[in-house]
Amino acid sequence: MCDVEGAQINIGKNTRIHGTCIHAFKRIDIGQDCLIAANCQIFDSNGHNSLPNERRTNNGEAKEIKIGDNVWIGANSIILPGVSIGSNSIIAAGSVVNKSVPSEHIAGGNPAKLIKRIDE
């Protein structure tokens, strides 16, 4: 769902998304051949300003999200604003990703941490 005029969500070929909430205030790019499991949430903004008087009138700062090709995001994961997930990476189920993940890595946890390179 694009929450403001001009926001973009781009989803590549052969990407499968199951029961996931995607909110774009700016831009979210999801590559080709990705698997995004059920109950994931992908937000490029916190959805509101932290100042009490501006919560209903100001969406806060949006930061683009980029998910590369052939990424697998496990169920119940949350991808936060400004994150990039490199191609061929895996995000473990239930992770909260608040920092970028390089290509060909497995990350998991809350907050998500790099676990290992996929080829190790």
Language model segments and positions:
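Flexible, glycine/small-residue-enriched loop-and-beta-strand segment within the central core
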Residues: 1-79, 83, 117-119
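Active-site-proximal glycine-rich helix-loop-beta segment
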Residues: 38, 93-94
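Extended beta-solenoid/beta-helix repeat architectures
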Residues: 84-86, 101
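Short helix N-cap motif at coil->helix boundaries in the Bergerat
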Residues: 99, 116
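Multi-pass alpha-helical transporter architecture, strongest
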Residues: 112-114
